[in-house]
From Swiss-Prot:
Active site: 165 (proton acceptor), 284 (proton acceptor)
UniProt cofactor(s): Mg(2+)
UniProt source species: Ilex crenata
Protein name: Ribulose bisphosphate carboxylase large chain
InterPro entries for the chain: RuBisCO, RuBisCo_large_chain_AS, RuBisCO_lsu_C, RuBisCO_lsu_C_sf, RuBisCO_lsu_fd_N, RuBisCO_lsu_N_sf, RuBisCO_lsuI
Amino acid sequence: VGFKAGVKEYKLNYYTPDYDTKDTDILAAFRVSPQPGVPPEEAGAAVAAESSTGTWTTVWTDGLTSLDRYKGRCYEIEPVAGEENQFIAYVAYPLDLFEEGSVTNMLTSIVGNVFGFKALRALRLEDLRIPPAYTKTFQGPPHGIQVERDKLNKYGRPLLGCTIKPKLGLSAKNYGRAVYECLRGGLDFTKDDENVNSQPFMRWRDRFLFCAEALFKAQAETGEIKGHYLNATAGTCEEMIKRAVFARELGVPIVMHDYLTGGFTANTSLAHYCRDNGLLLHIHRAMHAVIDRQKNHGMHFRVLAKALRMSGGDHIHAGTVVGKLEGEREITLGFVDLLRDDFVEKDRSRGIYFTQDWVSLPGVLPVASGGIHVWHMPALTEIFGDDSVLQFGGGTLGHPWGNAPGAVANRVALEACVKARNEGRDLAREGNEIIREASKWSPELAAACEVWKEIKFEFQAMDTL
């Protein structure tokens, strides 16, 4: 058969409903909204083609390779319940399409040009199944949950953090003072805000020095290991590594990176540096909502979370379920499990489209942060469990008596919740009662309870199934 020029329907080559997926395939679940008149099979096949080997017309050079070996295949299509003209298209990609150890390359293929494709009104990547054969080519998180606990010598409870506010405008010395007060009051960590890099009012080196001094002083006075997430995010990879090197020279335990604005290549480089040099790595997800908030277009956060676990990070922000930022409970717990656990079963009620086996890739601690305060502590302890970081920015620094009492209030509330849970009490039902009891012997907690007793952020969640 000679070369036949011309345009062929995608589904003739790329829609293969009888295909049996291989253990080594990367599987993707796309939410497809075809243009009027485009059948779902053609839309699904087009996604498979455009994100793998296909282009809009037959090309002569197709004959020089084995398309059957390399093409993506749309192997199943199902309508989305309750939505008109929306389908979930399942696509299988052969492993050989991807460079080993490169999240950048994986995403460039799977969520690259295809998202601008005219035959689709909208396209959203809901989930990815990463096969062990591919997972094994990644280092993953620099240390993981168990190693972090051993480094910090903290067990049996969530960790407590606080983002230093106002996020922009403080001088380095005043910033360091706030860090010291929070850590001295009983928090485990304080945090640079995601947009604190190296601005005219506070250059990075000055901030690093004052924060290091603050945390060593707090450490000496409390006998607990303390950390401050020093944001190493910078305009170039070289500058980022330079900042991480300086943090290591100061002897601090943890640095931080904005992985989406910084990019996966930079993030993976930093994760490798952190493992080689014993630094923990805190990841902030600034820009995620640009990608994941639209229900029918973009990428779900669970995909960004999986990508981060492969690229590397020891903590990542993951919504609160109860605060001011997005997060529906079951869906949030779904990707929290994908971050922490070795093996997660497929469970569509939690938005998990595929069984995910991480083999021996270390886990990532989910960070709950954004509009939370002492009254949320029982719910957060119950929802996230011990392996999490609970971060109270305004909920610490907004305390009427100042930063250190704000930290005391949060620590007392947390210890009370953990104690109550260990005694078998039901945090969901008795939460308010537990906090009230604890506030009787902690004036700091009592003052915090009074300030925030009426504050709620009640809006309809966008991230529904």
